[in-house]
Amino acid sequence: MIVTEALTKAFSGPFGAIEVLRGIDLEIAKSEVFGVIGRSGAGKSTLVRCLNLLERPTGGRVWVGGRELTSFDERSLRQARRDIGMIFQHFNVLSSRTAADNIALPLELVGLPGPVIRRRVAELLDLVGLTDKGEAYPAELSGGQKQRVGIARALASKPSVLLCDEATSALDPETTKSILALLKDINRRLGLTIVLITHEMHVIKDIADRVAVLDHGRVVEQGRVFDVFTDPQHAVTRAFVHEVLNRDLPEVLVPRLATTRLEGGPVIWRITFTGPSANDPVVSEMVRRFGLSFNILYGHIDYIQGLPYGTLVVEAAGTESARHAALAYLSQKNLSVEVLGHVATPDPVTA
C-alpha cells in the first residue's frame, strides 16, 4: 500500500544542507496501523509529509496504492491526495464554521452537490460519535471533539490512507485513549491504512500493528509491535520501551542484592513472560518439581496486541542443583531469566 525507497530529505541552512531523512525504506501493508516513533527532531513529521508529498523528497521514491507519487506533477498530486487523509496535532478547524461545515469543506471544494454533502457529513458525524454536535462551533467543543471533527474531515473524500501527525499529543490521557479507540475502530470498519506519527510509546502499544523507530533521520529498528516491545535491539528503542514497561528493580529491593554468591543463600531472578507461556503456572510447577521455595518480590503484567507480557522478580531458595534444573525448565518454556544478584547477608546486630 505505501512504500518508500531510499527516501531522503534535506533543507538548506546557513551552513549548508541539513539532512533530515537519510535513506528511509518502509513497506506499509494495506489496512494495517503502522506507527513511526522518535524523539523531537528525529524526522517524523518530515517523513509523514513526504508520504503525501506536502514535502517533496530530495531523493528516493514514494508509492501509495501502487502509484509512484514522486513522479507526479502538481495536478496529478492534487488528484492523488484525495485518497490520502491527514490529521494533525493542532486540530486546524475553522472557528467561523460549525462542526458539520468544517467536515463539509473538502467536499465543497471539489464541487459536490449540497444533498450529497449533507448526507456524507451526517455519516461522518455518526462515525466519529458527534451526531449531536453538527451545529456546534469549535469554541463549544472540547479538544477531543475538535480532533474528531478533524478526523471526520480527513475521511470526507473516502481515502484509503489516513496520516496522523502527533494527533494525540495535545490531548489529556483519557481523551487520547478515546481517540485511539476511534482510530482503531475506523481501521477495522473501513479497512483504512493508518500511519501514526508519535513520540509516545504507549500510543504505539495501544493501537499499532507494526512500528518503525526513527533516530536522526534513519530507521534504526522496525517490526511487529510485540516483538519490538519484548525484545528491543537498539538503545533508542530500549529507552522508549522503558518508558512504558519499566523493568528496573524497585529501589526498595536494591539494598537486598549482593554481587557475590553466598553459599546456600537465595538468588534473585527476574523472569520475563511473553506470549502463551505467560499463562502457565510456572512458579508453582517449580515448587512441585524441584522443591524450591520462592518469595515473590515484584511483578507486573501488561498486554501488547492482546498478548501478555510480564516480569516477575523472585527470591529463589534451594539447592544449587535444584536451581539449575529450574532454569533449564524455564528455558524449555521459552521464558527469559536474568540473575539479578544474591540476597545480601543481614547486617549484624550490635548491642
UniProtKB/Swiss-Prot annotation:
InterPro entries: AAA+_ATPase, ABC_transporter-like_ATP-bd, ABC_transporter-like_CS, ACT-like_dom_sf, MetN_ABC, MetN_ABC_transporter-like, NIL_domain, P-loop_NTPase. SMART domains: AAA, NIL. ATP binds at G38, R39, S40, G41, A42, G43, K44, S45. It catalyses: L-methionine(out) + ATP + H2O = L-methionine(in) + ADP + phosphate + H(+); D-methionine(out) + ATP + H2O = D-methionine(in) + ADP + phosphate + H(+). Residues 2-241 form the ABC transporter domain. CDD domains: ABC_MetN_methionine_transporter. SUPFAM superfamilies: ACT-like (SSF55021), P-loop containing nucleoside triphosphate hydrolases (SSF52540). It is found in: Cell inner membrane. It holds the Pfam family ABC_tran. Its EC number is 7.4.2.11. One of its GO terms (cellular component) is plasma membrane. Keywords: Amino-acid transport, ATP-binding, Cell inner membrane, Cell membrane, Membrane, Nucleotide-binding, Translocase, Transport. GO terms for molecular function: ABC-type D-methionine transporter activity; ATP binding; ATP hydrolysis activity. It is an enzyme of class 7 (translocase). It is a peripheral membrane protein. Part of the ABC transporter complex MetNIQ involved in methionine import. Responsible for energy coupling to the transport system. Belongs to the ABC transporter superfamily. Methionine importer (TC 3.A.1.24) family. The complex is composed of two ATP-binding proteins (MetN), two transmembrane proteins (MetI) and a solute-binding protein (MetQ). This is Methionine import ATP-binding protein MetN. It comes from Rhodospirillum rubrum (strain ATCC 11170 / ATH 1.1.1 / DSM 467 / LMG 4362 / NCIMB 8255 / S1). The lineage of its organism: Bacteria, Pseudomonadati, Pseudomonadota, Alphaproteobacteria, Rhodospirillales. The gene is metN.
